[in-house]
Amino acid sequence: MTSAHNAPAPKQVDAKHVGALMAALMAAIFAFQLNASMLSPVLTTMRVELNITDAEIGLTQTVFFTACAVFSLFLPRLGDLKGRKKVLIGMLACTAIGCVISACATNVTMLMIGRVIQGVAGPVVPMTLLMLHAEVTDNARYARLMAILTSVNGGIAGVDALLGGWLAGNFGFRSVFWVMCGVAVLAVVLVWSFARESTADETPKMDWLGAILLSAAFLAAYLAINEIEKLAGANWWLIAIEIVVAAVLFVIFWHVENAQKNPMVTTTYLKERRTWGLLLTTLLTMTGVFAVMNGIVPALAQDTSVGASMSADTVSLATLTPYALVGLVFGPVAGVIASKMGYRSTLRGGLIVSAIAMVFGVFVCQSPHIWGLVVLSVVLGLSYAGTANIMLNGLGIVLSPEDNPGYLPGLNAGAFNLGAGLSYAILYGVQQGFSDAHGATMGYTGAMIAGIILLVLAFLSSLLIPKPAQNAAEEH
């Protein structure tokens, strides 16, 4: 990586071009985000109209997010070699095709095929951040613009889900997929018109063997985590087999990469703190927070025996909407802070505030009230969705070496996905264990305490992340 002392001067980029580029990249992120979040209130309508079971409709979501995770591992690297604009347009085109297939689905198999193809859009965020970084080399300016793009990734302040519910209620679930398709096509046009092509400094042939082995190892680990999430209903023999398969495939991947002339990821980079330090921090952060806001808090809010006894609609408005809205609004502010204090310092601040918020959450679990849940959601929206999540994405870009800028954002996306799955497995497991032994209130409390411990570990792990050499603003 270029050091901060001998880095070339940032190139001057026309403000109008950057504005047009931001609009195009934002459209691409919208196209992906709608596929991820717009269907949440539509699942029941889809189940009824297709006459399928809850388990089958849940599986269509699982295959989408699994596809997102797998494609995220290698498409950013393919963009390094073949051209990021070209690959991004291909991803968006595949997403549009997947939306058409899903909109025309007459059975669950056809719907699953469509959702898998939509999952090609999984690495849109790291791809757009790499494209932005190729154009905007001034670190302070990049930090601010990066935060604007990334802040959208948590959902468009709940408006996307509300729109999805309205469309499904008035026009059926197929209308939702047609809207997604339209946004994806618009994104293709904007990226084609306003983005410039960029590649890595070196563009050897793609290491497809390494990509396949890494993807297979990740898929085995991901499937094991999905099975663990079933808790008492999990098949532990299957989990053990999948974990062994994942480990064996990763060992083979390691040896293959050592032997390759132009590997997908050199093992030298994998051994460095910029790789494993960041990936460990991302994994621990996601594991500590994700299921809290997307599972534990909504469940506590709706619990009629020991919770706040809120309706499902009220829960969304009181917890998930303010969480997403604050994250969306505060993200650009976090970018400004990062441009002055550095990514690592801003990340650590976000982790500390998140842990403090969850300490408050322990008291909320003991005496649940709507306003306590609102405060918890707002603070976590600010500290995690609007700060820590954005800084982790940003570090994946600025810590990457110039000869292979796509590998770390891809692996980091994998860590985000694994962390999300582990969060449900670990925090729900703790909740169930404490609940069985000490009652429901202690179940919620135990899950919150487990989240705090994981965030403390994430903070300690963040101390191992090295200073981004290309970030002259980083002081600590």
Give the label of every model feature segment:
Residues V18-F32, L39-P41, D54, M264-A469:
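12-transmembrane solute porter fold
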Residues S40-F71, V108-M110, D313-A318:
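Extracellular/periplasmic helix-loop-helix junction of adjacent transmembrane segments
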Residues E49-N51, G83, C104-M110, G172, ...:
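Helix-breaking motifs and short loop linkers at transmembrane-helix boundaries and internal kinks
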Residues T62-R77, P126-L130, T321-V333:
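Central cavity-lining transmembrane alpha-helices of secondary-active solute carriers
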Residues A69-V108:
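Conserved MFS/SLC helix-loop-helix module at the cytosolic interface between two early adjacent transmembrane helices
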Residues C94, G98-I101, T109-Q118, W371-V379:
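Paired small-residue
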Residues V116-S151, E202:
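Cytoplasmic helix-loop-helix junction between adjacent transmembrane helices
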